[in-house]
Swiss-Prot record:
Name of the protein in question: Methionine--tRNA ligase
GO cellular component terms, semicolon-separated: cytosol
Top-level taxon in the UniProt lineage: Bacteria
Membership in a protein family: Belongs to the class-I aminoacyl-tRNA synthetase family. MetG type 1 subfamily.
Annotated Zn(2+) binding sites: 148, 151, 161, 164
Biological-process GO terms, alphabetical: methionyl-tRNA aminoacylation
Cofactor note: Binds 1 zinc ion per subunit.
EC number(s) recorded for this UniProt protein: 6.1.1.10
Physiological role: Is required not only for elongation of protein synthesis but also for the initiation of all mRNA translation through initiator tRNA(fMet) aminoacylation.
Designated gene of the protein: metG
Domain tRNA-binding: 614-715
Organism: Leptospira interrogans serogroup Icterohaemorrhagiae serovar copenhageni (strain Fiocruz L1-130)
């Protein structure tokens, strides 16, 4: 089980933040999870490099720059600096942070494309697209708006309805218009270029006429499904494997890798006004970031890049969110293997982060930017808290601020830091801030921290190996449970020996207790280093140690004795609940100000007046949600069962998932349109409608009085 038994060469990446918005806690979660793993690998002596970059191409970046009156290059330069500042403020330590708009990325993208093309994995065909004659550009689906052809909701996107969850083609949208200028688009044909993903799945192999095939082409020994099932690349998560099996069973489709100009990105070789789709060159940004780093830092090792990207004895490890699983487990490995590179060794998939039991919400102040968090709270505290919640799966994580306060104040400040602070101030001052020697009793405690045998699964192992294994498996919650338990043991030793009494009665005995406590705390700081590096380094600084904490120092032969200890400086304060409240309130006010700015000149809607007779036809009743769950294939919908008293239980598909998680809805009383004609949807029958106000993350369900009963009619 010992993860450090052999030397490893590892290249690690986290997903690239997109360059049209600020860094928020979702980005920070992934950065911290990855950084902890990288720091651990380095701390046990492995060769490990951590790369990332800003994802800079695509229509949204081009339009954001146009809106600001600057060039895309100017926009991504500024945003890239902001992203790097915000991510590194949480102690995320990249070996290199780059931009996908780089010469290296363009060269590698071109190389991969031309190799895929030479091997017959590229095709082209004409497709119909919406085109804005005013803006002189083909419109992506998200830049077309209109009325949903299914439920007739207005102001819906060109590819799916956020109200009913229907998916459709932009040409099916009613009264469609360009979201930039408001004019109706026309349909034009355009040749697009496709990557033949099915070439890398044996199930999808099809016969091809002899006239169109070169026998040396369309041949690949790499089968995606076999790779997924046998390599262990995503083996730890049943949810991941289930989703991949669904995609394989449905068959892998050709992937459109081109976009028509105007477009901010790299032009496709040998094409006119055609650009690589952002998702082609974005993951190649991992390669370009590493290439730029290796060329600068290893000038005498020209094969350093190939030693990772073409050598399967090295490891390539990606950390990603579950929303980009398709790209990283299907397109990306196929592109690499089809162009003479190698597929990743591991793709670690994590869930999303919510705040106080709900999705991050701008209206509630819980859509928290990294910059705002750092303004009010200690980033090390978030690292500790997230680590305490992170396991090897892809479950979503909830940042409950009440739990955050309790866990940080109790387990970190009140336990692990407390053992240091309680012996490092007045007691050590009275001892001329000089350590003594470790007593026999103290040595037993230190050996317990370093070598004790602990049950693990069906067997047992040393505490060091268990912590190392848990780190390597990304089971950070297990790591912190073990370290906190050891911290309890150290504090119990301090309580039992009461050095604040000994300093008056037996100063040399007090010196022994302080020496044991600080040595034990130093070893805990090593264990903790990947999670809270700054706190661990502060403990090292206190002990006058110049090096960074390293797992090689987890050895009783490295006990510190008879050394001078520096004056104590505050290591970390407790979390202030008031700071959290101020932060959330500032977020709310900021969002409110934005809404006021954008609504200074609202377009008046035509109001439709109805008679009292019309209103009487609508039967509004109190309902109580008795069951709620997600809807497969519809990210915006929640399927709820609503108890309407004498009317029984009705099934409803509600477009509320942007603001409410299904697991938080059970038992909630709501207001329901109870006599709505049942509507057949592709997911099932929806028999009623929940009343709500607001849009997007500001959406709020109408909640009746607490004494209202299911079935009560509103009058």
């Amino acid at each position: 089980m010992n993860s450090s038994s052999s030397h490893r060469n590892i290249l690690v990446t986290s997903a690239l933040p997109y360059a049209n918005g600020p860094i928020h806690l979702g980005h920070v979660l992934e950065g911290i999870q990855t950084d902890i793993w990288v720091r651990f690998q380095k701390a046990i002596g492995n060769e490990c490099y951590f790369f990332c970059a800003d994802d800079t191409h695509g229509t949204p970046v081009m339009l954001a720059a146009r809106k600001e009156g600057i060039t895309p290059e100017q926009l991504i330069e500024r945003v890239g600096q902001e992203h790097y500042r915000d991510l590194t403020s949480f102690g995320i330590e990249y070996d290199h942070y780059d931009s996908t708009h780089s010469k290296a990325n363009q060269e590698i993208s071109k190389d991969i494309y031309l190799k895929l093309k030479s091997k017959g994995h590229i095709s082209r065909r004409s497709i119909e697209q919406s085109y804005c004659e005013t803006d002189k550009m083909f419109l992506p689906d998200r830049f077309i708006k209109g009325t949903c052809p299914n439920c007739k909701s207005k102001d819906q996107y060109g590819d799916n309805c956020e109200v009913c969850g229907a998916t459709y083609s932009p040409k099916d949208l009613i009264d469609s218009h360009c979201s930039l200028c408001g004019t109706s688009p026309v349909v034009k044909n355009s040749d697009h270029i496709f990557f033949k993903l099915g070439d890398f799945h044996k199930k999808d192999e099809k016969s091809t006429s002899l006239e169109t095939i070169n026998p040396s082409h369309l041949k690949t020994d790499f089968d995606l499904q076999s790779w997924i099932e046998t390599s262990g690349v995503v083996s730890e998560s049943e949810g991941v494997k289930k989703k991949l099996k669904e995609w394989f069973d449905a068959g892998l489709q050709d992937w459109d890798i081109s976009r028509d100009g105007p477009y901010f990105g790299f032009e496709i070789p040998d094409e006119t006004n055609k650009y690589f789709y952002v998702w082609l060159d974005a993951p190649i940004g991992y390669m370009a970031s590493s290439k730029n780093f290796f060329e600068k830092n290893f000038p005498n090792e020209p094969n350093k890049f190939d030693s990772f990207w073409k050598n399967k004895n090295s490891e390539i490890v990606h950390f990603i969110g579950k929303d980009i699983l398709y790209f990283h487990t299907l397109f990306w490995p196929a592109m690499l293997e089809g162009s003479d590179y190698r597929a990743p060794s591991k793709v670690h998939v994590h869930g999303f982060i919510g705040v106080n039991g709900e999705k991050m919400s701008k209206s509630r102040g819980t859509f928290i930017k990294a910059e705002t968090f750092v303004k009010y709270l200690d980033p090390e505290h978030l690292r500790f808290y997230l680590a305490s919640k992170l396991g090897p799966g892809m479950d979503d994580i909830d940042l409950s601020f009440e739990d955050f306060i309790n866990k940080v104040n109790s387990d970190l400040v009140g336990n692990l830091i407390n053992s240091v602070s309680r012996v490092s101030t007045t007691i050590l001052d009275a001892l001329d801030r000089t350590l003594g020697v470790v007593s026999k009793e103290g040595l037993a405690l230190i050996e317990e921290i370093l070598y004790q045998t602990v049950k693990f699964g069906p067997g047992e192992d040393s505490i060091q190996n268990i912590i190392k294994y848990a780190y390597d498996q990304r089971n950070y919650a297990k790591v912190l449970r073990e370290i906190t338990r050891l911290g309890d043991r150290v504090n119990r030793y301090v309580n039992d020996n009461a050095p604040w009494k000994l300093i008056k009665e037996n100063p040399e005995k007090a010196r022994e207790v302080v020496t044991v406590t600080l040595n034990a705390s130093r070893f805990l700081a090593i264990y903790l280093y990947p999670v809270v590096p700054k706190i661990s380094e502060q403990i090292y600084k206190l002990l006058n140690l110049q090096d960074s904490p390293s797992f090689k120092d987890l050895d009783k032969n490295r006990i510190l004795e008879n050394i001078k200890v520096l004056p104590y400086e505050m290591i970390s304060k407790r979390v202030d609940e008031k700071a959290i409240k101020v932060m959330l309130e500032e977020n709310k006010q900021s969002e409110h100000s934005k809404k006021v700015e954008t609504s200074e000149n609202p377009v008046p809607e035509e109001r439709l007046e109805i008679s009292i007779d019309d209103l009487s036809k609508v039967e509004l009743r109190v309902g109580q949600i008795v069951e709620a769950g997600p809807v497969d294939g519809a990210d915006k919908l929640v399927n709820v069962k609503v108890d309407l008293g004498e009317l029984g239980i009705k099934n409803v598909f509600a477009g509320i998932k942007v603001a409410y998680q299904p697991e938080n809805l059970k038992g909630l009383k709501v207001v329901v349109v109870a006599n709505l004609k049942p509507r057949k949807m592709k997911f099932g029958i929806s028999e009623a409608m929940l009343l709500a106000s607001g849009e997007g993350e500001s959406l709020s369900l109408f909640i009746p009085h607490k004494d209202a009963k299911p079935g009560d009619r509103l009058k």
